């Protein structure tokens, strides 16, 4: 292989520019697992976490008296990644049409999760042996056949591999979770990645949270650049859907937090029952250890397929106790046909050169362990042992997402080889060109246009013809058989047109050992009907207080941000969760108050008619004649009209009644007061006319009284005419004065005109009171001055009391106040002026004579 050039100084600079760990290239060097063939694919896998001193072994937590700073774990289930590659290569070799009867081999190394060991493994693939000699091909029979490399499992491992392979332009396919950072590193060749539509993943998580109404959640991400991007994107998506975080923590894969900080971190995990974790198994490995150490349980963990928690080597039920009931999202994978059968057939004697199967078998079947780093004794293992017999906590027969990526990566390389070899065959019919493996860099054009694309700042779709993306949702639950498994409970479909569909069978979901029902994950209890949310200062928007809706507003849903104002013609019920139609209110004839007022008005009107009839019958009696019969008739008729006009105030207000009732009231009352004023004036003028030498005649006094009545009434008519011509009364509604009622009332239009009418009546009444008061001592048996004085006092008292009562009342009460004022003042005039005369007419009419009258 003549790929190696004079890049040794550059290789050394790149590999050692960061002090990752004190690791020597020769420390525990492995020869790798090699299978010869015409073309060889390199594989760099991670089967063990060694971050320092032993903390946790396969049986669980070893020492619970303190928290170690380092962790150790054999990830036995990650051996499935290697088997997926072996299975894919064997399957390809069985099909002569893919590689034109050429075979495909592999060269595999375990780099754990150590970045320097990943660099060593990369150089071992280029050098042909381990420990490697940088920039030198020790085994050209191996290195000349290398066409591509698959690895690593994380971003940091992939970067170290890429730093070496990119110098020699060897294609690298990373099976790590998609990371935009891999495409932005300053290096010659970025690794190829399997695309992952993170927008679909975040949308799926959000829709799941909304489905269960989980709006108060925690978020845990790895403390690296990828975690920063996760945190930024998923936070933005969740906040836009009304979901907020109880906490957002970053977890380092190295020991950078002391015990106090870890205790504080564990306390924060108890703030909410639902925790979202976005990251891979290795980057979040430490949090698993501390959750078990602090015995934190009862949380619902929402994860992605990258955090394949069942791969961790713990004793039976230990993982399920703390993480059971969790939900995980995985991009839909087609089942690899024949892979489970292949796993059942895997045995050490079938693959005697597999250096990894020995450790796996000894762990799964209880064989003697590694002896002095050299010897293995598998004689005590089950001779016919099968991986399918192992429980879930030890081995998983289901294809993991990582295994699926490795399998797909092998086929992507095989497809690229097929296309490259096809070009050779077209140019050379003798097939001599197929004798040598193609140079690795020649596969780049085919990998770029195939299912895998170069990683850039934008994610590449695996299949550009398929716009819809489907995610499977799994629930980690315990089966009736006593084993634990990931059970598919739903799926989420997302396409480029933003069409989303979440289907979930929540009836088969279990929530672990500590919960029997769906957990409630909210910061504040839901605000019931009739209450709205108000923010709590210093807390996220999901934390709120519930306050009752103000008057006139309702909340007909739970957790309303603002109450809804009822329409003007409706009002809220007592619970303030529904708007009810307001009741139309006016002083109706059927109302008890309306009935009483109607009866009173009719009775008083009839009573005034009876007095009028009495006066007509006894019109020739001295007392009737002495008090000016015509004015008495006019006054009684006007009072009867006053009683009758009050009936127009009762009933639903209409345009005609609103206009006529105040106008008629004003004019009729002006006639009444003018007639009383004329009567008072006659009393005074009569005594002056009978004095010796007076120029006044009784006929002149009578004509003058008629003029007073006409003049007083005409002025009121003019005031009413101006009122009607400018701003007349009209029917109106009052929706706000009384709760739950719409008051139908007559708006007086011009308030000034209304009070001018009342003021003019007050002026006439005051003038009558003044004249009557001055004439009260005139010597006459039929002198009306005293009764008029008393009647005017009653009249003025009623209407003076009317003004404040009228202004302070609303609706039916306001109308009733005016009706009572009309009836009371009219009844006062009727009683004070005419009842004494009726008494005289009916009981003492015989004792009066004209002679006595003139005395």
From Swiss-Prot:
Tissue-specific expression: Expressed in the basal epithelium of the vomeronasal organ. Located to vomeronasal sensory neurons that project their axons to six to ten glomeruli that reside in globally conserved areas within the caudal accessory olfactory bulb (AOB).
Chain positions carrying an annotated carbohydrate: 101, 295
SUPFAM superfamilies the UniProt entry points to: Periplasmic binding protein-like I
Cytoplasmic compartment segments: 617-630, 684-706, 775-786, 836-855
GO CC annotations on file: plasma membrane
Subcellular location: Cell membrane
Keyword line: Cell membrane, G-protein coupled receptor, Glycoprotein, Membrane, Pheromone response, Receptor, Signal, Transducer, Transmembrane, Transmembrane helix
Annotated GO biological process: neuron differentiation; response to pheromone
Keyword flag Nucleotidyltransferase: no
Extracellular side: 23-595, 652-662, 728-753, 808-814
Top-rank lineage group of the source organism: Eukaryota
Membrane topology, record value: Multi-pass membrane protein
Signal peptide: 1-22
MF (Gene Ontology): G protein-coupled olfactory receptor activity
Membrane-traversing stretches: 596-616, 631-651, 663-683, 707-727, 754-774, 787-807, 815-835
UniProt-listed InterPro entries: ANF_lig-bd_rcpt, GPCR_3, GPCR_3_9-Cys_dom, GPCR_3_9-Cys_sf, GPCR_3_C, GPCR_3_Ca_sens_rcpt-rel, GPCR_3_CS, GPCR_3_vmron_rcpt_2
Similarity annotation: Belongs to the G-protein coupled receptor 3 family.
Described purpose of this protein according to its UniProt entry: Putative pheromone receptor.
Name of this protein: Vomeronasal type-2 receptor 26
């Amino acid at each position: 292989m003549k790929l190696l050039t004079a890049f040794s100084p550059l290789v050394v600079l790149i590999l050692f520019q960061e002090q990752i760990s004190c690791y020597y290239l020769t420390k525990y060097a492995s020869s790798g697992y090699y299978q010869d063939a015409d073309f060889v694919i390199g594989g760099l896998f991670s089967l063990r976490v060694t971050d320092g001193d032993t903390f946790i072994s396969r049986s669980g937590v070893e020492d619970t008296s303190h928290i170690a700073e380092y962790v150790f774990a054999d990830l036995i289930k990650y051996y499935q990644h290697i088997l997926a590659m072996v299975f894919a290569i064997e399957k390809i070799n069985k099909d002569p049409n893919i590689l034109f009867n050429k075979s495909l081999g592999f060269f595999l190394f375990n780099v754990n999760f150590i970045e320097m060991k990943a660099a060593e493994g990369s150089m071992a693939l280029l050098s042909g042996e381990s420990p490697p000699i940088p920039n030198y091909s020790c085994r050209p029979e191996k290195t000349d056949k290398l066409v591509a490399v698959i690895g690593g499992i994380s971003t940091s491992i992939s970067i170290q591999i890429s730093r070496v392979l990119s110098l020699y332009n060897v294609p690298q396919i990373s099976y790590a979770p998609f990371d935009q950072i891999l495409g932005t590193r300053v290096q010659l060749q970025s690794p190829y990645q399997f695309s992952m539509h993170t927008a679909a993943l975040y949308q799926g998580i959000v829709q799941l949270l909304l489905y269960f109404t989980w709006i108060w959640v925690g978020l845990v991400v790895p403390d690296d650049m990828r975690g920063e991007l996760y945190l930024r994107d998923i936070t933005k998506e969740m906040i836009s859907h009304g979901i907020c975080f109880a906490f957002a923590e970053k977890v380092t894969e190295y020991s950078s937090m002391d015990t106090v900080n870890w205790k504080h971190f564990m306390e924060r995990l108890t703030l909410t029952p639902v925790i979202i974790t976005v990251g891979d198994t290795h980057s979040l490995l430490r949090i698993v250890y501390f959750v078990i150490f602090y015995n934190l349980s009862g949380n619902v963990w929402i994860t992605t397929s990258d955090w394949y928690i069942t791969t961790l080597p713990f004793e039976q039920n230990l993982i399920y106790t703390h993480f059971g009931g969790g939900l995980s999202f995985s991009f839909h994978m087609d089942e690899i046909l024949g892979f489970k059968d292949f796993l059942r057939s895997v045995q050490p004697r079938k693959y005697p050169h597999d250096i990894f199967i020995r450790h796996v078998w000894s762990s799964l079947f209880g064989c003697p362990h590694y002896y002095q780093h050299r010897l293995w004794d598998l004689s005590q293992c089950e001779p016919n042992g099968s991986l399918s017999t192992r429980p879930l906590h030890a081995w998983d027969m289901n294809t993991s997402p990582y295994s699926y990526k490795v399998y797909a990566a092998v086929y992507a390389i095989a497809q690229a080889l097929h296309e490259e070899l096809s070009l050779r065959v077209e140019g050379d019919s003798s097939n001599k060109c197929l004798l040598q493996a193609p140079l690795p860099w020649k596969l780049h054009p085919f990998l770029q246009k195939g299912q895998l694309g170069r990683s850039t700042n934008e994610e590449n779709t695996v299949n550009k013809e398929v716009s819809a993306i489907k995610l499977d949702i799994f629930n980690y639950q315990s089966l009736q058989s006593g084993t634990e498994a990931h059970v598919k409970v739903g799926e989420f479909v997302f396409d480029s047109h933003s069409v989303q569909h979440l289907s979930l069978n929540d009836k088969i979901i279990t929530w672990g050992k500590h919960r029997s029902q769906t957990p409630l994950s909210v910061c504040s209890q839901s605000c019931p009907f009739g209450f709205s949310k108000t923010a709590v200062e210093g807390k996220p928007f999901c934390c709120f207080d519930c306050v009752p809706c103000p008057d006139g507003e309702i909340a007909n849903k739970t957790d309303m941000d603002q109450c809804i104002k009822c329409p003007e013609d409706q009002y809220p019920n007592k619970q303030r969760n529904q708007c009810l139609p307001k009741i139309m209110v006016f002083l109706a004839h059927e109302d008890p108050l309306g009935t009483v007022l109607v009866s009173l008005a009719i009775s008083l009107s009839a009573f005034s008619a009876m007095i009028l009839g009495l006066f007509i019958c006894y019109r020739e009696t001295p007392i009737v004649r002495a008090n000016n019969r015509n004015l008495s008739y006019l006054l009684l008729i006007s009072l009867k009209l006053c009683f009758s006009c009050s009936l127009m105030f009762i009933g639903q207000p209409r345009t005609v009644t609103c206009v006529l009732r105040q106008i008629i009231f004003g004019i009729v009352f002006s006639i009444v007061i003018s007639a009383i004023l004329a009567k008072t004036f006659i009393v005074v003028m009569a005594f002056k006319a009978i004095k010796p030498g007076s120029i006044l005649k009784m006929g002149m006094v009578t004509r003058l009284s008629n003029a007073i009545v006409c003049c007083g009434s005409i002025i009121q008519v003019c005031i009413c005419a101006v009122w009607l011509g400018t701003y007349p009364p009209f029917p109106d509604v009052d929706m706000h004065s009384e709760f739950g009622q719409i008051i139908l009332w007559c708006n007086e239009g011009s308030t000034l005109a209304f009070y001018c009418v009342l003021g003019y009546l007050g002026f006439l009444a005051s003038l009558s009171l003044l004249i009557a008061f001055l004439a009260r001592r005139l010597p006459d048996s039929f002198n009306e001055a005293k009764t008029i004085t008393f009647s005017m006092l009653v009249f003025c008292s009623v209407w003076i009391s009317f003004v404040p009562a009228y202004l302070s009342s609303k609706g039916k009460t306001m109308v009733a106040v005016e009706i009572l004022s009309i009836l009371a003042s009219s009844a006062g005039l009727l009683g004070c002026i005419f009842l004494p005369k009726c008494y005289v007419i009916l009981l003492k009419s015989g004792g009066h004579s004209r002679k006595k009258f003139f005395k």
